[in-house]
């Protein structure tokens, strides 16, 4: 009985991983159940039986992938700028190019906006948590501005500018980001 439950769980994970992989290859809501089934090594009926619809599959896959991202980024130590930047760089080295493609596709495929918006929410919450010690500014206006600065500097586009456009090594890009964040973490 346990072996059967374990096999069913593994099948579900293979299906979700297939959906996530296909999505990142070509960010679109036009993912076919047949492609997902083929990639996962199961029948289309298995995918439908398990998730009911393409919409449910995509929602489940997004939630499943999001949990992995949250776990990865959750390792960032609060108040430790170099440590947090290292975790952020790990994340962007794995997902950065994909996220940039998603954000570009969002313009053409408005249905992707929900996924992009969720990513923005996760990023904002991460910045609030990680940089909490530096958000104790004197006023709400200052806190809001400082948070916006952290969000912008730690954005995937900053990673792209440093790594892809400027051609910096990961180590140099990480150092550059720490240097850019440094003035925001000093008392004025």
Label every model-predicted segment.
Residues 21-25, 31, 56-87:
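Amphipathic alpha-helical linker/stalk segments
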Residues 35-38, 151-156:
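Short acidic alpha-helix initiation/capping motifs at coil-to-helix transition points
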Residues 8, 40, 44, 78-82, ...:
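Alpha-helical bundle regulatory/interaction domains
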Residues 86-90, 94, 110-148, 154, ...:
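Amphipathic alpha-helical packing segments from all-alpha helical-bundle domains
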Residues 50-51, 60, 176:
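Residues in the recognition helix of alpha-helical DNA-binding motifs
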Residues 14, 18-26, 72, 98, ...:
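Solvent-exposed, amphipathic alpha-helical segments
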Residues 51, 104-109, 153:
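Short helix-capping/turn signature of helix-turn-helix
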Residues 1-39, 44, 49, 55-56:
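Basic, helix-initiating cap at the start of DNA-binding domains
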């Amino acid at each position: 009985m346990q072996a059967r439950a374990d096999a069913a769980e593994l099948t579900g994970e293979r299906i979700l991983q297939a959906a996530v992989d296909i999505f990142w290859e070509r960010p679109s809501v036009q993912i076919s159940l047949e492609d997902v089934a083929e990639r996962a090594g199961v029948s289309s009926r298995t995918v439908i039986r398990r998730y009911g619809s393409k919409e449910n599959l995509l929602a489940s896959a997004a939630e499943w992938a999001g949990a992995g991202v949250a776990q990865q980024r959750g390792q960032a130590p609060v108040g430790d700028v170099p440590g947090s930047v290292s975790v952020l760089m790990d994340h962007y080295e794995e997902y950065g190019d994909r996220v940039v493609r998603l954000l570009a596709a969002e313009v053409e495929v408005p249905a992707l906006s929900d996924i992009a918006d969720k990513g923005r929410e996760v990023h904002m919450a991460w910045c609030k948590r990680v940089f909490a010690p530096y958000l104790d500014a004197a006023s709400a206006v200052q806190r809001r501005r400082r948070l916006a600065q952290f969000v912008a500097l730690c954005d995937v586009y900053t990673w792209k500018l440093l790594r892809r456009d400027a051609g910096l090594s990961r180590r140099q890009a990480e150092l550059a980001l720490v240097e850019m964040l440094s003035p925001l973490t000093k008392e004025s």
